[in-house]
Amino acid sequence: RVGASVQSPFVPTLRLDATQPLGETIAALNKFQPEALVAYASVGRLLALAQLEGQLEIAPHSVFTSSEVLTEESRSLIAKAWGKPPMNVYAATETATIAAECEYRVGMHFFEDLVITEVVDDQYRPVPPGEYGEKIFVTVLFSRTQPLIRYEMSDSIRLTDEICPSGKPYALIDGIQGRHEEVLHLPTPSGETVAIHPNVFHDVLDLIPTGGWQVILEPTGLRLLLVGVRNRDDELKLLSALR
């Protein structure tokens, strides 16, 4: 069952639907007062904003983010809200945790005693450290119910040869771009195409105080929807950054 790995009869756990209204989530968290907060990266950012604005009043000892790319802006915002940077985790429903940051946060350590992870290009050839792959293969070593051998995931990640100050021997991920199929391929005036990764929009739009945003790919180009842009200066700043 999805999320079963975080359920325990010995540890009080509150599971919330990320799609429910934010106000309901805030009210539930204020009542529950979690000691550890685990959230999608985008939801963690929204909760951090709510904490800074005084709507959310919790004091977790640890904050974990997962399932989405954690931008530096979101990391800083979460650290500001709760006095500690989040611990980023790389996981999938099918495989459980694949890698996670340690206290030094210089990258994410593979759980090499639990999963074997291979970074490959679009021709399934191994990709060396320092380069982003097109996808990964994951072999799960602990699942006896549903064996997964070289399970293909379209995540684009980059390894590094650097050694973590912690001294842990596990290989490090130093970059995650997310799912390869989320990359937009747009025409250029010269008739060629250019690849635009969703992180480009995060890097720009996360800096603007909005209630949310959505980018829609249409036959004639991109349409950007914004919620709650507070003033004209923010609009001009956003247009300048996008250009």
What are these regions (language model features)?
Residues 2-243:
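Active-site glycine/GP-rich loop and adjacent strand/helix microenvironment
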